[in-house]
């Protein structure tokens, strides 16, 4: 067998996508529902765990135990203002565990708490399985993408999520960089080009400026808004229709979670329709207190409802241009990424800002990031195809990195947007006479004072020989590797004594043991999911068999061919089984199978005798199909809402 391909995963806030590079091109892989993007949702019920479409589809029925937006929690502390403000909007509960946020849900009748890494790992496991189902062999190697402004601990935590999902994470790369790679393949050999990537997704907005020169990518600047995306546009529509419902029916549905959730689903659908049509209609039966809600909305009205949000997308564009020290006339290409860039008004605003420049939308905006990640995965696996041969990837540090010097001043060694991997060294000295040691405190951020920046870690270099202030020479080196992991070393030049810290943000990070434990738990949950699937198919098989038998003996065409006694025997037994099923929906697989054997012992002799007697064309048809029941015919889908 050829060596297995590596995959690229776009782990999104609201949706995720997976791709693979094979036979010289990228394939974006559809899930079992036929969708090329999968909701980043995980749901827990009394009987099972659902991931992706299945989880999102039942959210109206089970909002407290359906988890999404794990990407907004990952790598953050519980006390982080972002976490505190986001928590107010989520229907699921977030609890504090040693200043780490955990999501608390009820699963199989027990209260369980999961780290964001675990929730994300479940989504990653789903993406891995989607790829495996398509490729037909196990997949372990993957490139996973993160937003450009993710800091060190968020990157690390994402990597941990990959490990828990059983992946070997080849590299974590920036989403815009991935989109640029997707874009760069068809753009080699044109001299240096400045590309602006405008990524408006389901929950977040990112602007990045890259320079591409002969297959080499360099990220010049990044900007964005972590809380702007398709969901905000949905919210505007929801609020609009809640008000309309009040006007029309004098009732407020906003406190009824299920009604709002059904309305939101309809709004999301309407929004998508409005990207291609100028009008969309909503029809929701019995939305609230038995009232059917039938209404419509025009594209113009939708644009007006969201006009301030749409306009606000241009501010980060201006900021990125300033950071990259480029004028808008110097941008050669504009690339659209993220489903929300399909909105005509958003495209028009961007196009007008760049004085009518053409937008590049040849890549499906939902898939561009996974596309690039798949290419990058192929490169890292040593793919020799000429399409990827000449591509080299330079990434950047999203925030300045430095240390605290006298008076709480932030002294940056690695400036924001520096190309990584990179290494910077600077000499520092002591602040007071005979100072025995120095405390090296490492920060990330753009503010002048360290108190306004984010402390990544600290360590001490002790044993400095007594000397007047300003005499000792302490050499500090900041070294970032290709994954954005930071090593800081301090060396006393006189003694050669050194100390170092690797910032994978240990305070915010999971320990090796915790990751191990989570890997095992992930396996356990996966096994439980399998058991649950088998159980359900055994139940369905029994149910179909019972109903098939019942309808067989009640068939008008069999009158006179079966004795009333036999008929009663079969019907009574079927009825007994059907009643037992209603009372024991949660029985185990072998109980269902045992019941089925019991039922077969009663039915088979009668049915076989019946058909041998009848001898008709139907003889084999029914007996052959029935014992299979539901199990052979694939999963059955129950409609929700």
Curated annotation (Swiss-Prot):
Chain positions recorded as ATP binding sites: 12-15, 71, 202-204, 268-275, 339-342
Phosphoserine PTM sites in chain numbering: 631, 633
Gene Ontology terms describing biological process: chaperone cofactor-dependent protein refolding; positive regulation of microtubule nucleation; positive regulation of proteasomal ubiquitin-dependent protein catabolic process; protein refolding; regulation of mitotic spindle assembly
Residues bearing the modification N-acetylalanine: 2
Protein family per UniProt: Belongs to the heat shock protein 70 family.
NCBIfam families linked: PRK00290.1
Protein name (Swiss-Prot/TrEMBL): Heat shock 70 kDa protein 1
Gene that this sequence comes from: HSPA1
